[in-house]
Structure formats: structure tokens, C-alpha cells
């Protein structure tokens, strides 16, 4: 339905990617190529690349840059980090030398257990604590409490007022009014 048609970092989780792959496999077994779903898979895989490229372009390099990431679960209101786009994003930035601090309201413990890079990242006690001194904020999961954050307080916490909103939770005009350079997805 409409809840799955928002611009963003892409889809993940333990079911939907597997379901898409199954539909493609069944269609191929039946001799009816389902090119639309193949393209959906391809676009989803490229979304994270494009987002990482945009962050790298703004920061020049990831090496030793302090980046806050809000959200690790594949969707809000769960602790499930399996096949999470957010996890892939964190792994990519860490691989390029970023100093990443993360916060997720429910998925912190699961992330500590399951993330291969868990020993290389910091886990904050709150969204604002994660943003303390950050040169960029990356929003990877659309938790309601992230959208409710006081932008003035967030601006005070960050070293550089740069937001990469992978879920479009903030109004770009409101963010700009608080001095942020704001980059969402699919907003021009």
C-alpha cells in the first residue's frame, strides 16, 4: 500500500527482500521474466550507493569524520536489524574510516550482537547524545521520536549542521531555518 511508496534509502528486513527474490525465481521457472521486479531489486541496491556517495561528496572523505546515525532497525517499532539498510550504511562508512556513533530506540542490543562492525562503532544513550560533536547526521530509520527532536537543540549539539535524511522525516525549510544544510531523498 501507500505506506511502502515513500522515497527513502530503500527497503530491507528479513521478509520483503526474500519475497521479491522468490517472485522473480517463480516467474523465471514459469518462463515469464518479471523484469519489473528485477529492476526494483537493482534500484534498491543502488539507493545505498547513491546515499553514501552524497555523504562522501559533502564530507570529501569519511576517514576520521564523526558521523551520527539515527536508526539501525529496518523499520520503526522493531529491534530487527536483519537485512537492514541502516546496517549496510553503517558498515560502508566504517569501512571507509568514519567514526560512527549510532542510536536506535529498540535495536541497540541486537545490533551489538549481530553487527560485524559493532566493536568499531559507538552506541549512544539517546539521539541527541549520538549527534554530539557530529560533522553529519544520517537518519536511517523513521522513528517518530527522531522527527520530534528539537532542531535548535540538535543544531547546538552538532559540530557541523549537516543532515542526510534517508527517510525524509524533517521539513527541509524548517531544517534550513535552523541553519542546517539538509539533504533528503527524492526532494530535488
Model-derived features: where do they sit?
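Structural/interface elements that position substrates and couple domains in central-metabolism enzymes
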Residues: 1-188
